[in-house]
Regions:
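Short, acidic/polar
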Residues: 36-42, 156-161
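Glycine-rich, proline-tolerant flexible connector loops at the mouths of alpha/beta enzymes
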Residues: 1-15, 178-187
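Short hydrophobic/aromatic-enriched beta-strand-loop microsegments
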Residues: 50-58, 79, 106
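Active-site mouth loops of central-metabolism enzymes
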Residues: 6-10, 30-34, 56, 148-156
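Catalytic alpha/beta core domains of metabolic enzymes, predominantly
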Residues: 65-179
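Long, contiguous binding/interaction regions
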Residues: 15, 23-26
């Protein structure tokens, strides 16, 4: 996919879908990838991808979201929608509604923070009140947190994961790489599988605590 600026690693295209199919075959895990165009949707459906997600820059463009929604008509597949890059709840809800109006029922939202010129602490400001309001507006919608994109630095992932759990998010999307420093994109926000396992085991999930 196109990066914020040209020149960075933008993926290998359709060839990568075959890799995901192999991962699914070897591990039995569901596989997921981002779609930004109707062509992406068609290729992913043809490859048997289990879950699709709409990226933050795409969510901010109703034209692109509608194109994706049209391509998904008549298809039953889970679709997750990231918040738009700008802090606009109506834009986020609008993207969810466009996909819902195409007949898809298995929808979820991903909170990955909002762009800001000031990046003193976070890569993307969490502005937790926005996903909290989304929960109030659409109570049954699963909402996941992406601490990797919010934090932008691996040392922030653990506390952001715990904060998301404290706010009753339904799950986490954390970037992991066997050798994070050698990752071709977003290396600073990735953790090894062992560190990810450690972070997850440390989480305190209040809904699971029996008093």
């Amino acid at each position: 996919k196109p990066r914020t600026k040209p020149g960075g690693f933008e993926g290998i295209g359709v060839e990568g879908l075959a890799w995901l199919k192999e991962v699914k075959k070897e591990t039995g895990m569901y596989v997921s990838t981002e779609v930004a165009t109707a062509k992406h949707v068609y290729e992913c459906l043809k490859a048997g991808i289990d879950i699709l997600w709409v990226g933050a820059r795409t969510t901010a463009n109703p034209f692109a979201v509608q194109e994706i929604a049209d391509a998904l008509k008549g298809v039953d597949i889970p679709v997750l929608v990231k918040n738009p890059v700008n802090p606009d709840l109506e834009l986020w809800i609008g993207a969810l509604e466009r996909i819902s109006n195409a007949g898809l029922k298995r929808l979820g939202a991903i909170h990955r923070g909002f762009s800001s010129y000031d990046k003193k602490i976070y890569r993307n400001l969490p502005q937790w009140h926005i996903p909290i309001e989304l929960r109030r507006r659409i109570p049954n919608l699963p909402i996941f947190c992406d601490p990797s994109h919010i934090g932008g630095k691996r040392e922030l992932i653990a506390p952001l994961c715990q904060q998301a759990m404290d706010l009753n998010f339904d799950g986490l999307i954390v970037e992991s790489h066997c050798n994070p420093d050698c990752a071709w994109s977003d290396a600073s926000q990735q953790v090894t599988p062992d560190v990810l396992d450690y972070i997850l085991n440390l989480l305190v999930i209040l809904s699971l605590i029996h008093i």
